[in-house]
Amino acid sequence: MAIRPIRWPGLAFVSMAAAMVMVPTVSSALEAQITRTRYGIPHVLASDWAGLGFGTAYAFAEDNVCLLADHLVTLSGQRSKYFGADATVTVAFQDIRNLDSDAYYRGTFDDAALRQAVRSTSREYRELIRGYVAGYNEYLRRIGSAHLPVACRNAAWVRPMRDIDALRLNEDKMRLASGERLASAIVGAAPPTEPVASAVPVADGVDAWEAITGRLQVEFGSNGWAFGAETTGGAGVLLGNPHFPWTTTNRFWQVHQTIPGKLDVMGVTLSGLPSVVIGFNRNVAWTHTVSTDRHFTYFELALDPKDPTVYHVDGRPVRMETHTVSIEVKGGPPVRRTIYRSMFGPIFSVPALGLGWTREHAYALKDADELNFRAPDAWLRVERADSVAGILRAITEPVGIPWVNTIAADRHGDVLYADVTPTPNVTDQTPASCLPAKVNAPLAKMRLYVLDGTTAACDWSPSPKPGQDGLLPASRLPRVLRRDFVANSNDSFWLANDLAPLRGVPDIVGRVDEPQGLRTRNGLKTIHAAIAGRQGAAGAAIGPSAVKEMIFRNHNLAAELALDDVLSICRQSTDALTSDGKPVSLADACAVLSRWDRRMDLDSRGAALWVELWAPLARSGAGYPAAAVAFDPKDAVSTPRGLSLESDNPAHVRTALADAVTLLASRGVALDARWGDVQKAVRGERRIPIHGGPGSNGVLNMQEAAWTPGVGYVPVHGSSYVQVVTFDEAGPVVDAVLTYSQSTDPASAHFYDQTELYS
């Protein structure tokens, strides 16, 4: 594995092999200079914001035109027209039917409201997206439909971008962690025609939530570390390691953007966004990790007994709004769908959670990130910050950055952790009467909040700042500036630095004194070991090389914590039954696990067996199985640990191991298969070995992979963009890699080159 150093080229690009192109429009009203350096990274130079957006979109289209064109079809609600109603598309990291996707986007994206909302943004941002639309369209005009990549060549669904598309692209990204998770439940909500039961056992409710919305903390992941002067001996060092999809429209893309005298920033953006969202400038570097905040709440509506589309607020009947859309369908007649909306937001129905639409009640979703156009300007401020204090100001003034923590380090040796995101103003002081006990009790474990919709007094508490009504004020949201280190791997703010735990934050933001995920624990253990190992030593500072070694160590924490007890169970007996009662000898499996290096390196043997063993064990205990040493909030980094050897737990472990042995045999995978031979990225005819492993195993270099017959474990999300940044007198010193490469076009050399580098 390698990640490459990035030179900070400024405006000269003199030391870099490059291909440069000037890209004027037909009218020459917009212009940008695009310089491609190694691995196809574009450096976009423009004299103004519109030109920067123009060049950025043009360069993105060169790499990913079919990806973006396809996504525009999704956002305009036309997938059924071109691809059929029953085909699927990924929405908020879930695959749903095209018909449901079309109904969701057509029925819940209000173009008039989007146009109104964008008026509150800065002129810089409005010019940026004006140029972005023009740049994408200029690329289509120049290349022509017949010369597009094979995936969209001469396709009827490829069309020029419109201004409204740029606004939809922003809205789509804002809702990823909230409204879009319930897209199918929103479009499936319909008034009942007969009484419907809504009670549900707690355990079934948990399972239903995960089945409907996906496991947010698994699919949305990241590691963010920042080391300050007390650990580096000088300038800060930042690790940015977001775990995002390797496919579909939420891929990252690298770019360097420059407007002389106004902006000089490099990093990654997401497909369809015009600005760098994770990156660095000459003075500061930042990254994001998905936060634990709930960016939405539900409202329980009391319905009129005579009409389930009428609800009562403060004794007054209110009729639901309806939005009926007619969806064109390939090879069939149009289909009509109706979306229902209350004063709080759209109606949804999840009967398995006790949130079905019955004669008595319906449930509405209120989303803090709906129409969030504060985010684009927040990122523009972050890009121009000159310190972590400047970044903190950039994110706290608008409270616009959606659903992510911010971790940053600067050249002065200061570091920042902040969870400042749009979060409903629902606190521990919210009256109990506003949280109906019957419906909330089964949802408390998941921190899902159902408010009483019968009175406006239970709506989100007013906020003093204009444009942030109903949101928690920034002063109530957690943040810390330090000089030693901060870290986050998607657990709450509590242990951003475990030497000084944070408390006193509303529950809707996150909880304290709860078991931490294995990546959080592995990260903190690794950081403390690195600090301890350098104390009193020559060259004791933690620098970029040390940080790279830490993140790519591929250490499996689950194995460190539990494998010795598995081997102890093996020594008791190697006879086992699978979960369906078939006898299996575990002798070979136990021998393989005893020799395994407990890492997820390419040459590790036994890793596949452990992955398949640990998966059911972790599920049985909501992240960690029955432990020998239980969780202790005073020792959260080290507990829980071990496996319980009491009662029937050893038999349960043997069964899980027998199932793993049987599963690997059915797939033709040897128990001691080399990990790099079974986990591979597919790039055309190339099969590229990939290291790293599941986050549920505590592997920092996370790769969640799907079994693909004939190939093996194929990464679907995990380490995506990795940057390690520090600063010297000349500017930022950066090592970075985009694991899945810049382009989605198989004909491009940049479809696979960084994937091979990462390997």
Which role does the model predict for each range below?
Residues 19, 27-32:
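Boundary at the C-terminal end of the N-terminal hydrophobic targeting segment
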Residues 361, 401-530, 613, 617-618:
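Hydrophobic alpha-helical segments
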Residues 46, 51-97, 287-338, 461-516, ...:
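Gly/Pro-rich active-site capping loops and adjacent beta-alpha segments
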Residues 2-15:
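Bacterial N-terminal signal peptides that target proteins for export
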Residues 497-582, 677-759:
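Terminal end segments
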Residues 30-249, 260-262, 266-275, 280, ...:
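Substrate-recognition/specificity elements adjacent to catalytic centers across diverse enzyme folds
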Residues 259, 267-270, 279-283, 288-448:
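Glycine- and hydrophobic-rich flexible loops that cap the catalytic core of alpha/beta enzyme folds
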